[in-house]
């Protein structure tokens, strides 16, 4: 009996067609399955914008890299014609060296999904988000090769930092959030992120 192998994900051309279709709701590919994305609520979008504004002062001022808002990155197969996964974080940072290398190696990159795993991902938790779903996304990001994930919790006014090598660390109030080696020079008391 011949065994059928089912390839998870979708062809790159199909992925691009669906992403460009105005009638297709936004989606991610998680574990090979198409998962519809929930719309961003205003408070989460505002917190992401505020954090991006603070971070970009250091990122742009020191030419450290690029901070993207709600841009999808894909996990391509080795032949780049198949998408095995896609993620759309609230914010993501890619170092200038990695991004410039990617752009130079990929002519026409602007017309294709971003096939580059970010260095840092930031997710802003909405009141409707389930903790188990957020933690699953964190695990997927780290498995994808993201070096660090920040989870911003508006309800608790805290940020939890996840890496592959260290236990999660939660910061709040006067504790200082830093960009570490990824974004040297960035530091702010966590409370500043939640000021109106």
Give the ranges of each region predicted by the language model.
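Gly/Pro/Ser/Thr-rich low-complexity, intrinsically disordered segments predominantly at protein N-termini
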Residues: 1-196
């Amino acid at each position: 009996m011949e065994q059928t192998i089912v390839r998870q994900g979708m062809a790159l051309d199909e992925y691009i067609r669906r992403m460009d279709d105005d009638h297709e709701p936004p989606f991610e590919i998680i574990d090979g399955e198409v998962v519809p994305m929930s719309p961003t609520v205003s408070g989460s979008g505002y917190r992401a914008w505020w954090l991006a504004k603070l971070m970009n002062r250091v990122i742009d001022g020191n030419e450290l890299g690029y901070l993207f808002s709600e841009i999808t990155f894909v996990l391509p197969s080795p032949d780049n014609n198949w998408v095995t996964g896609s993620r759309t974080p609230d914010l993501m940072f890619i170092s200038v060296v990695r991004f410039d290398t990617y752009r130079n190696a990929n002519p026409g990159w602007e017309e294709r999904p971003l096939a580059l795993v970010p260095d840092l991902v930031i997710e802003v938790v909405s009141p409707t988000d389930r903790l188990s779903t957020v933690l699953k996304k964190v695990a997927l990001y780290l498995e994808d090769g993201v070096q660090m994930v920040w989870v911003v919790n508006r309800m608790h006014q805290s940020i939890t930092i996840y890496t592959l090598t260290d236990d999660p660390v939660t910061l709040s109030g006067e504790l200082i959030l830093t960009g570490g080696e990824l974004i040297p020079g960035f530091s702010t008391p966590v409370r500043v992120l939640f000021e109106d």
